[in-house]
Amino acid sequence: MNKTKVESGIKMANEIEKRERQFLGLPMVLIWGYIAVAIFMTGDGMEQAFLSKYIMSLGFDNSEAGNVLTVYGLVVAIASWLSGVMAEIFSPRRVMTFAFIIWMIFHVGFLVFGLEQQNYAMMMIMYGIRGLAYPMFIYSFVVWITYSSPSYKLASAMGWFWAMYSIGIGVLGSYLPSFSIPIIGEMGTLWSSLIFILIGGLIAMFLVKDKKGEDVEAQRMTKKEMLREFGRGITILKNKNVAVAFVVRIINQLSLFGLVVFLPHVYTADFGFTTSEWLRVWGLMYIITIFTNLFWGIMGDKIGWVRQVRWFGCIGMAVSTLAFYYFPAWSGPNIFVTTLIALMFGFAVAAFVPMSAIFPTLVPEHKGAAVSVHNLAAGLSNFLGYGLASVMLIFASAEVTIWAYAVIYVLGFVLTFFMKVQQPGRQIKTTVNTQSN
């Protein structure tokens, strides 16, 4: 019996040691999950640069193509909100597997019954339902990270997550079609995305060995408790700190989504850029975020999550948003200046990385619900980023619109003073310092 206890203790110690093993904050026990996210998002992102244009080439007008994407975006927002709680109830691995299967089935339906038949209703239905998949896949993995990463290294772990996301959707997903479309065309490229989804999904299913991803709360919950847990994805906003963090997270990416509504035209019509030059500026910014997501994830654990969001995120974005307009307005298409503003913006927007760690830290007993609220805020940031620009430009110039975004980031700066977060690692250090004195 003692031998059994010793073996059990050794096994538990090995599990803890494995979970604590890291590389610059990346939990090695989840490394295949991070790789799965990058590959999966490559497949999901391959269509983003050309799908609306391709739908129009089939004979549909701009508004019809836009409606397909709008329905998709609405479903994505809903799925983003539900994904955290679903992962908590049914386990991250199960929800990721479900999402992977949904993506494959409805993408094939979108291609066969929608695009190939030029059936508008089927495009809306199939592509819309496919919108459930990617948020459930990636945000379930976020819940998995909160389960398996040490709390004092959570921002670093989230930085790696967003870096993998950027590599997938922002870099590979955007650049690969530029090579594949001339060879196999748009439909061939859309079919080829299934390869990346299949590889990413299978990696998540079979190569991530961490058992934390199989925790199933549903087995310990009644149906009433399950419904209450889903409801908590909204009622959790009664927590003042969560509500403030929710608003700050919405503010986070407003410029990232909003500037693309009008700056492409401003850069080409007013500042003397070609379309290719503008795209290179914006593409460079995304490449920079791969590295800055990692940098700020690690730095946040060292200098403090809220402090980083306050000064480098909110103030950084206020300054870099204005720079994105005024620097090229003064210099024209100067490569040094455009590289500088891409660097500034890429550094500032990634400084919000700790927000992914702040939400589950604020409500540690309901991490899934906390992640769901974070995801809802991310979806609203997307929606309101576009919406603010669209509304402002009806009444004001592009210059005034830029200032509106900058002022909102200053508002976010003020709000961070009302966001009280007990950062685990800093608590430990403070306690050690106090005891040593």
Residues covered by each model-derived region:
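Helix-to-loop junctions at the C-terminal end of transmembrane segments
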Residues: 80-91, 293-305, 393
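Extracytoplasmic gate region of multi-pass secondary transporters
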Residues: 47-49, 241-282
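Cytoplasmic membrane-interface "Motif A"-like loop-to-helix N-cap segments
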Residues: 89-100, 302-315
